[in-house]
Amino acid sequence: EKADGSSYICIDREWKDGDKVEVFLPMKMRLETLQGEDDFVAIMRGPILMGASVGTDNLDGLVADDGRWGHIASGKLVPLSETPVLIGSKEEVTNYLNGLKPMEGQTLRYKLSGIFNDAKFDGLVLEPFSRIHDCRYMMYWLCMTADGYAAYTKRTQEEEKRLMALDARTLDA
C-alpha cells in the first residue's frame, strides 16, 4: 500500500513471529531556497543536506578553537565570483541532480559536471555535508540561468571588489 506522503498507513493484521514490514522512502534531490535570498539554494536528498569540498587552500584561521570568539572563522575570504555557481533554472538543476547516479561503490556521492558557471568546477563531488571536514566547502549555492548569471556578475563585480578591499584593511580588535 502507498501513502500520499502527508499521511500514514494502518496495518491491521494479526502478527506472527518473523513477520516483517518493509518501508521504502524515495529520496529525490530537491533545492531549498534560502529565506530572503531567492538565488541561493541548499541541495537536499530527502532530509540530508548535501555539500561539496572545493579545496584546502588558505585554511589558516579557519579551524575553530576553544578560545574567546574561537568559533568564528577568520581566514581569507573568497570572492563569490571564484565559487561554483549552478547554471540553469531551479527546475533544470533539480532534474540534472535527480539524473545523477552515485559514484561506483560509494554511497550518496555524486560527481558533478556541466552544470557550473566555469568548467574548472567540473568533477566536484556532492556528498552529505556531515562528511565534509577540514576544507572549504559549498553548502549554499548560487543558482541562476545563464542570462541571470551574466547580469548578476556585471552588477556585483565592482561591489565585491570594494567589499574585499574594505575587509583587507579592517582590523577586528
Where in this protein do the model-derived segments appear?
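C-terminal beta-rich recognition modules with glycine/proline-rich loops and embedded aromatic residues
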Residues: 2-4, 13, 20-171
